[in-house]
């Protein structure tokens, strides 16, 4: 077996010796043969042969490209290989090499079965190439494609390199080549590859560059005949008109055999109006080769107009301006400064000859119309290209620039282009337009097109190309522009198009990677039908512009409602991010003032779409100023800030916002002093009461930090999207845990209002959905005070040090509304902010007295609730308390859960979150034991030993504990079953880690002593004693 493999390897065709002494393969790889050596034969012999052709053939029967056998070459290679093998085998005996054959690479064999997984096989480089080719054939067969197909070189879009390489391969096969010839052919092939990668410069505009694409994307693909009448060019917008000009058959190209990437006219019936000059390398200078079948009609507009008239039997007035987009020649950069000088010298001759040719064409225009109508397109193109050939016969190696001369006929028709170009490293190109006083209606479209072509490239400026949005197909755009009739709208938009180019959403959309600007506001009033059409067809920016124009025209609330609640808008296909963007774009219209609505920059810093993370003193002042600016700038038509506070006016102001979500910018733009704030902020009230600890000061822009975050809204804008679904998104419970649902909101003044300066309070229905029953309680939360009022630090300290208690029990009836007993004005809610659990009765009595004198702060409400509670206390008015129905409802509420942690973004928010949780646990535990004991005594399960201190009791005592608690617990872990994390366990962990640290210190000390002193038996024994210092051998071997 070894001898057979050695024979096969010696007979392998592609193996040759490199200069370095190793064996290399001449079998071409898929990207071209990258192995090149001075001793190897020319690459051109096998440059067109792929390894897929060599599969399954005996190497002895393989033929060269000229048909001669390779057997003679293989015999010579065999002798070389045997000589080398004998010399290598002597060395391998001495050095104990593992491979059986000396000069090969060691490849890993693919595992065909389990026992061959680790087996390696000695494979030569040529054999490995054949293995890869076999694998490629197998994959192509599996995919259902032709397994014998050659690999495509995607870098070469033109066939010039393949044709030249095939010619050179034939030449090299016939003539025996020396090493110098090999080098020349190698250099030529490298130059050809380099030319294909060169980015060509053209005298084209960035908008027209989009038209250069393979004809497989054309809409007339594989059309056998040219259509008699072209579709009229509609003026839907400037961008689609450029595309239609490019795809119209006026600029159909004659067939060219050497350009396989662009099909012929007879097959396609259309083409792009640019022809790339095929560059070839014949000598040192790079030249532009003009094919005889190729048509360069940049000098003359007359022949193009005659050509278009012959193609169209019924000539429409819209086709006149199509003549202007003549085919512009591309220039390739010269190699040296000499070529630039020669080109500048020849430039004047070219201009003069071009003028003469254009004059001749002016005289013979009538003849051309009669002749071109009867001849096919290819003959016309050949005749037209003869004029260009006369110019080029003088010096074909020069790089030439074609200059477009405006003919008299075009200027009489009303417009022409003047193109100026100069030779430099960065070509300066200008597109100018000469309008005439009497302009036709069909020209309004081409005017906007021309104005977008008026781009000037400076030497150092960065030119940003117009990029289509990825969501618009060219076919869809073309069909839309064909289906829209221009008609009456053209007369209205004529003056606008002359004054300014129309902003198309594909250019100025958010999807564009380069440009972003809010859309221009559409002028004129929009009907509902037009509005629905635009909502269905156009992009997101069109919708934003439509709604903004509605608001400028003082549209009614119902119209805005139809826009935002349109089912077609909510059912748009798209990813989650696109839905988010749609919703944010519509909901943030109010928050964008008019001063920067049309600016091409991003949203301002004080926009409500930005959330400020973290808080400093400067941030709060900045946000305070920005909020005041917003209130002055934004439209608050629907809510009258200083109007009456009757419920009717409030309902009228809130009606269109019935389906609004948490964090809508309308809720963040209302002034803080207004009485309607509670009604507009009804959605963010519950979340604010839970996460109010994120701001230490009553700054509304900071307290609504989380409610304006896009995490809360989840990007949905349906009508049925209520607050319940928002909170289910924020706290995704897997079990049927209770959620807080806000049902209605109403304004109620305080019942016993004696002083006129008393603030109003908003009463919110809070519905606690338990596992089976729902108990709704009316709760009371005070509104924010204004910014100007300073905080009383003493009150805050008293409130922080006071001990919290749970709310008092109601009357045993089934009334929902809870009234306080004895008119005591404690604002003690479900939790309080701070307070370590005290273990003596005197501390408890003191804390209860403190709670009667000064109200304790609610963890959910902001710090401002304390001062408002004190003002209520002076009034002795009744307040409705906000607390949960059962113990389960409180323990499983979002207040006690960590589910909201994933929604918080920054480290500051998480830090505040954990700090608040610690305060919640300590405050909750401080009054919990007495509350549970009081519940048990009320149910008769515990004997009445002594009357408990005046505390509150729950609404219902459905929760019955299995184990009675008679004394207040010393640690929070004993009182509540849910809190499993104990301080003692934490201390044990820390003590363990500290013990390990001390042990490491002892070990280091022992090591240092060992290194300093001589190693003796006593020092070793001491170090071993150190390891058992803590009574345990912690993983060490003694």
Swiss-Prot record:
Which residue stretches does the UniProt record annotate as biased composition, category Polar residues?
1-14, 506-522, 955-974
Tell me if Phosphoprotein is a UniProt keyword of this record: yes
Q: Where is the composition biased (Acidic residues)?
A: 72-83
List-wise, which residues carry Phosphoserine? 112-114, 436, 618, 856
Cellular component (GO) terms are: cell division site; cell tip; cytosol
Any idea where this protein resides? Cytoplasm
Give yes or no: UniProt keyword Phosphoprotein.
Answer: yes
- Keywords, sorted A to Z: Cytoplasm, Phosphoprotein
Q: Name one GO biological process term.
A: mitotic cytokinesis
Q: Where is this region: Disordered?
A: 1-100, 144-201, 360-381, 422-441, 454-526, 556-575, 803-864, 940-974, 1005-1024
Residue stretches in coiled coil:
none
| Any one Gene Ontology molecular-function term assigned to this protein's record | phosphatidylinositol-4,5-bisphosphate binding
Query: Which residue intervals are annotated with compositional bias (Low complexity) in the record?
Result: 156-179, 826-859, 1009-1020
Q: Where is the composition biased (Basic and acidic residues)?
A: 58-71, 180-198, 426-441, 489-505
What is the name attached to this protein's record? Uncharacterized protein C688.07c
Q: Which organism is it from?
A: Schizosaccharomyces pombe (strain 972 / ATCC 24843)
